[in-house]
């Protein structure tokens, strides 16, 4: 609630806190294999504005692993028709009620009737020049709902993540906050911390860290900030963040040697 600067919906926060444990149990039942400690307990890490280690993970590909498990389970359900490569272009609305969708399937336009329509299209990161979102996240789900007459709220709440790998002619790649949670530090060209004055420093709320980094870059007339991994033992870094390290190495970067 504090990290939300007083803007959090209290009921939503309470719902998350109360129901998170049983949701995790359900994911485990579905086959989600979170990382574990040597004693078999669930391994947790620290992220921004958290006072305790509570974030479950699967190395540095938690989201990918979660989607794989849920997709596999969904496709096992009888009576489910799964359509890939089909784009929804319009919601079908009659008498103020959504009763289906119009889809583009190759060169064909098709209407599909449904008793219920759920839009789960992700965000709109690709409305911005720089984003780590997948290419499909262009805000189309929100636009579809708005065009059909749905009430839209809280569009101003766009999260700007502080750390990403930004190189010429390459998509932005997210550098997980968990890297800082495991001991990495943000540094400027002289090795000083641009977030030292923030409560929580490298793990202050994301909006505060993002603003501090932007302010530092403007003052120093630079377009990037470094991330010093020296606080993470090499073996631990290789085990926890193989995807991030592999992506960096594809571009001849080794964050374990040079911020």
Q: Where are the regions that the model predicts?
A:
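Conserved redox-cofactor binding core of oxidoreductases
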Residues: 28-109, 113-116, 120, 164-167
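An anion/pyrophosphate-binding glycine-rich loop and adjacent beta-alpha core
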Residues: 144, 150-259
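Extended, hydrophobic alpha-helical segments in both membrane/secreted and soluble proteins
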Residues: 117, 137-144
């Amino acid at each position: 609630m504090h990290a939300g600067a007083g803007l959090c919906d209290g009921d939503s926060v309470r719902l998350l806190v109360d129901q998170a444990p049983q949701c995790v149990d359900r994911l485990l039942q579905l086959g989600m294999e979170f990382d574990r400690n040597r004693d078999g307990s669930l391994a947790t890490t620290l992220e921004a504005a958290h006072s305790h280690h509570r974030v479950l993970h699967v190395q540095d590909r938690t989201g990918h692993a979660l989607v794989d498990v849920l997709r596999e389970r969904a496709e096992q359900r009888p009576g489910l028709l799964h359509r890939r490569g089909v784009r929804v272009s319009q919601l079908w609305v009659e008498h103020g009620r959504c009763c289906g969708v119009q889809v583009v399937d190759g060169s064909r336009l098709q209407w599909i009737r449904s008793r219920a329509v759920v839009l789960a299209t992700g965000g709109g990161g690709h409305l911005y020049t720089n984003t780590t979102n997948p290419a499909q996240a262009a805000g189309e789900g929100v636009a579809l709902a708005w065009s059909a007459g749905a009430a839209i709220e809280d569009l101003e709440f766009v999260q700007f993540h502080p750390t990403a790998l930004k190189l010429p002619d390459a998509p932005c790649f997210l550098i997980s906050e968990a890297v800082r949670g495991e001991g990495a530090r943000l540094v400027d060209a002289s090795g000083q911390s641009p977030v030292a004055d923030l409560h929580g420093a490298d793990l202050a709320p994301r909006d505060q860290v993002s603003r501090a980094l932007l302010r530092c870059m403007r003052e120093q007339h630079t377009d990037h900030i470094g991330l010093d991994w020296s606080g993470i033992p090499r073996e631990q870094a290789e085990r926890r963040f193989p995807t991030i390290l592999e992506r960096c190495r594809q571009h001849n970067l080794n964050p374990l040697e040079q911020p």
